[in-house]
Amino acid sequence: KINIALLTGHLSQKEKNEIYQQLENGQIDIIIGTHALFQEKVQYNQLGLVITDEQHRFGVEQRKALKDKGNKVDFLVMTATPIPRTLAISLYGDMDVSTIKTLPNGRKKVITKFIKGTSMKPILKDLKDYLLKGGQCYVVCPLVNESEAITGRNASDISKAMAQYFKGQYEVGLVHGQMSDEEKNKIMNAFKENKIQILVSTTVIEVGVDVSNANMMVIYNAERFGLSQLHQLRGRVGRSKEQGYCYLLSEATHSEQKERL
């Protein structure tokens, strides 16, 4: 029998202590977890293999911290975010780097368009036509609420405006990091079941979301997101044989921002 356990920061201290003890005694064969796996207090009986997904979220020091917890530990690290070869060598110089350039069978490359400004008017017809065909759409904003310190469209206002505009035609949902896990799960499940056709959100959807019927994404103030975030966000669409579309709305003026987009 293979024993599998989960270690995250959400567990109670009692649950964590039980897992720590079982790991040290070799009673757990496979441990799945978050950054909690790097902690000093976590000791492994005989760590031999580490598989890291979303590697761009972890640093070199964190990888070393895990490596030091075993003897001759094998590593497999994965990321969907393209990393320039020179950067890859500096980050993973001690590892073999392989790049998969082909898409999964039947998948199409996501069509990405840059739209100058922060108005949805230039793409409104495309959005309506897409929704009319039965598709679902993500609308991503950099802020939850209006901010005096930071400029950018906020999810709360955008969701209200879209709900008013599409009233009686399509359901609009809102999800962001300030919601409880229960609230977020309720909205995400409604979106998966197509009870919500337009999901307005912040970056909480950038990982772990897979809705094959949602193949259009609109990103407001795209210049406010990093390259890895943009790749992760865009990765939410085009996850089926249907064509995916990603619209980057931006008033970017700096050359670096424009290059990134």
Language model features with spans:
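Inter-lobe coupling/hinge segments of SF2-like helicase ATPases
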Residues: 1-260
